[in-house]
């Protein structure tokens, strides 16, 4: 009988946390027709539900990130404020950071490894993580992956990487 009571406490806190995550990620009107926006909203929601420790980075984020998937001719804006993420279809306002890449490269960022210090640095044994970092670096060197404004907002970029990655 004691187990049932403890279990119900665990269930209720799990439900509260999931409701908190659900309400923290919003699609602005029109963004639900942007497939990449819907996919990124689901990714962040799932990451926060599966790994609650990512919530501290999420809650600390302030500012906006524009993402342009050039091959799909799709753009969106991630607006972080007060523990909430609103995703807009298209570029809204003047973003703090802009990312331009193929849709595959953007989605592949969710596979970046997160090391012990919270940095996207794989261990030498992590072959998949090394491959992702190599692909991103090659695309950047070849001009197929561009990050504008990231150097001026390194904290935001690190938090975004940790929140978006399924690892860590």
Regions found by a protein language model. Name each.
Residues 2-168:
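Feature captures hydrophobic
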């Amino acid at each position: 009988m004691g187990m049932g009571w403890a279990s119900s406490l665990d269930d209720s806190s799990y439900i509260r946390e999931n409701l908190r995550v659900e309400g923290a990620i919003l699609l602005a009107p029109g963004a639900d027709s942007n497939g990449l926006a819907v996919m990124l909203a689901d990714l962040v929601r799932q990451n926060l539900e599966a790994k609650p420790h990512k919530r501290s980075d999420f809650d600390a984020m302030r500012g906006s990130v524009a993402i342009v998937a050039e091959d799909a001719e799709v753009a969106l804006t991630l607006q972080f404020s007060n523990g909430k993420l609103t995703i807009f279809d298209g570029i809204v306002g003047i973003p703090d950071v802009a990312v331009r890449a193929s849709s595959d490269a953007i989605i592949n960022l969710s596979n970046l490894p997160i090391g012990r210090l919270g940095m996207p640095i794989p261990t030498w044994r992590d072959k998949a993580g090394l491959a992702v970092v190599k692909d991103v670096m090659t695309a950047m060197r070849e001009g197929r992956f561009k990050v504008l404004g990231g150097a001026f907002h390194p904290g935001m970029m690190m938090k975004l990487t940790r929140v978006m990655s399924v690892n860590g």
